[in-house]
Design a protein with these regions (language model features):
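Alpha-helical scaffolding within the catalytic cores
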Residues: 220-224, 239-246, 271-282, 328-338, ...
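An acidic-aromatic substrate-binding cleft motif
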Residues: 190-273, 277-299
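Boundary at the C-terminal end of the N-terminal hydrophobic targeting segment
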Residues: 23-27
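Substrate-binding cleft/loops of secretory-pathway carbohydrate-active enzymes
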Residues: 333-354, 389
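Ligand-binding face of N-terminal immunoglobulin V-set domains in extracellular IgSF glycoproteins
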Residues: 28-192
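Bacterial N-terminal signal peptides
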Residues: 9-20
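Active-site clefts of carbohydrate-active enzymes
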Residues: 368-398
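Catalytic domains of carbohydrate-active enzymes that cleave complex glycans
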Residues: 278-303, 314-331, 338, 411, ...
């Protein structure tokens, strides 16, 4: 059987089978490897592979899962460690480049709404989603003493316990093959498996090509913002005092500057537009080099009475170098900000998939004008598009930011909230009665509070990791386009994610597309000598 670090696909990751197969046959605990796009059920039958082969660019995260199974005897005092990776010419990727998490299962007590279409929820049950880190993300020191700890752990009879492994390939790594090992220790014995990594001859940009804006309501500390950015997702707003650090170390490239007009889906009223000088003062306080935007109104496509006020807001912010972002379908009434320049009153149109499909003509019109279009996701709005709720297949999270966004020329992504936690978020992801009588497990909570695991800020969910991998897929396509191979790049992208309806549900197909992109870029970069992404590889606008 063969896997990659992100999905099941032939010829990429080959596992040794002898150790785990023998263990299962004897009814003793087993260890095996699973790809990152595979959810390991609490009682799934054990797999059979123990060795890992990965391929990745510099500056890229690549992930896999180390799974322990208690079989008929259980497993106690389990820990997992990873060695340095040794590479060409004495090069070393230190073990500190790996981040490990114990996956915590959460219970979905009732299914997300099921529209009976091509993309249906998987229903009630226990899902691995929350990630308990082994080490502090800032200091790298082991965590201990919190109410939830990663290691050591026990595995009950017949149950599984996966460990999520992130490898961040250093931006300074030389291309070539690197090898090392992981070791699982327990009271019942130890197992060591091999890790092989091929570092491709190109580097992902520190600031992702795909813009994003994900909102914190209560947990937006600097530590929380850095955790989001580590996962290639940008917070909505940032403090000007923190921006230099976030730009240098975490790839921040855009920020919302405020203010909000007060208009949203339930309120067709806007406050008067701030003056040009007010917008200029706000803009001047931000760090140079950031794309500045104002998320001025939310879901107001039904509020035609607001169009004159929207134009005034846009005209004033445009004179201050700020872009206007509104979640609504394009409408010709807002194709001008009233200045006579031809610039639209909305620079960044943010659409749900169903909104996009219902306004394709208008989307083409605003893109032709030079506006940009982003996507967003919430609840269950249709029967066909990707969903970001816990009981949907992992492919849902990866396909939207990556291949669908590239195929539809979308340049950004928005999510309304990442920290809408119930009173006990580590043990309850359900919310029936909050948005409707239905349950939308995990809606508005892509991160978990850090206090319970002993870290500042927040910790990621597996869903956030899959979104991150999609953002990296977007970069792969963007880099290949920048190397003069746009037709090939788009052909590969559209083979798996052509639009909101016809995207693949096959994790192996996604990994095959990524592998083809990576190998092609690696060959082109090796032939032409440069080792970083070509200039001009960013999408226009944003």
């Amino acid at each position: 059987m063969t896997f990659s670090g992100k999905a099941l696909v032939p010829t990429i990751l080959v596992f040794s089978t002898a150790l785990s197969t023998l263990a299962v046959a004897q009814g003793t605990p087993a260890v095996w490897i699973a790809p990152s796009l595979h959810r390991v059920g609490m009682s799934d039958a054990p797999g059979s592979g123990t060795d890992v082969n990965l391929s990745a660019a510099r500056g890229e995260y690549e992930s896999f899962q180390i799974v322990t199974n208690g079989a008929s005897k259980g497993l106690g005092n389990v820990n997992v460690t990873i060695s340095d990776l040794q590479g060409p010419g004495g090069q070393v990727i230190p073990h500190s480049s790996f981040t490990l998490y114990r996956e915590k299962y959460v219970q979905v007590n009732s299914s997300s709404p099921n529209w009976k279409g091509p993309n249906q929820p998987m229903g009630p049950g226990w899902y691995p989603d929350a990630l308990i880190p082994f080490t502090d993300p800032d200091s790298g020191k082991p965590l201990a003493g919190a109410s939830l700890t990663a290691v050591p752990f026990d595995v009950k009879t017949g149950k599984n316990q996966p460990v999520w492994v992130d490898l961040l390939v250093p931006r300074s790594a030389e291309p070539g093959k690197y090898t090392g090992t992981y070791t699982v220790t327990s009271n019942q014995g130890n197992l060591t498996g091999s890790i092989s990594l091929k570092v491709w001859n190109f580097t992902l940009p520190l600031a992702p090509s795909l813009k994003s804006s994900f909102l914190f309501f209560q947990a937006g500390s600097l530590a929380a913002q850095r955790e989001l950015l580590r996962n290639k997702i940008s917070p909505l707003s940032t403090s000007p005092a923190d921006q230099p650090l976030l730009m240098k170390e975490n790839g921040l490239s855009a920020t919302h500057i405020g203010p909000f007009s007060g208009a949203d889906i339930g309120r067709c009223n806007m406050s008067p537009a701030p003056s040009v000088n007010q917008f200029k003062a706000i803009a001047a306080a931000q760090q140079p080099g950031l794309m500045l935007y104002d998320y001025s109104a939310d879901e107001i496509g039904h509020c035609s009475n607001l169009y004159p006020t929207i134009r005034q807001w846009a005209n004033n912010m445009h004179q201050a170098g700020i872009k206007n972002l509104i979640s609504m379908s394009p409408t010709p009434a807002l194709y001008s900000d009233g200045s006579g320049s031809g610039r639209s009153a909305v620079d960044i149109w943010v659409l749900l998939p169903v909104m996009y499909n219902n306004s394709k003509k208008q989307v083409d019109e605003v893109m032709t004008k030079g506006d940009t279009v982003w996507s967003y996701n919430t609840l269950v709005q249709d029967a066909y598009s990707p969903k970001w709720l816990i009981d949907f297949d992992p492919v849902n999270f990866r396909i939207q930011p990556g291949f669908i966004s590239q195929s539809l020329k979308l340049t950004g992504m928005l999510y309304w909230r990442v920290d809408k936690w119930p009173s006990d978020p580590w043990n309850n992801v359900n919310n029936g009665g909050t948005y409707s009588s239905s349950n939308y497990p995990g809606e508005g909570m892509l991160v978990y509070p850090g206090q319970q695991v002993g870290v500042k800020g927040v910790v990621a969910s597996m869903r956030l990791k899959w979104l991150r991998d999609g953002v990296e897929d977007y970069d792969y396509v963007q880099i290949l386009k920048g190397l003069g191979k746009e037709d090939l790049a788009m052909q590969i992208s559209r083979s798996v994610g052509p639009d909101w309806t016809n995207w693949t549900r096959d994790a192996g197909a996604i990994e095959s597309a990524r592998q083809k992109l990576g190998e092609t870029i690696d060959q082109l970069m090796t032939t032409s000598a440069p080792t970083t992404a070509p200039s001009g590889s960013r999408p226009s606008g944003n």
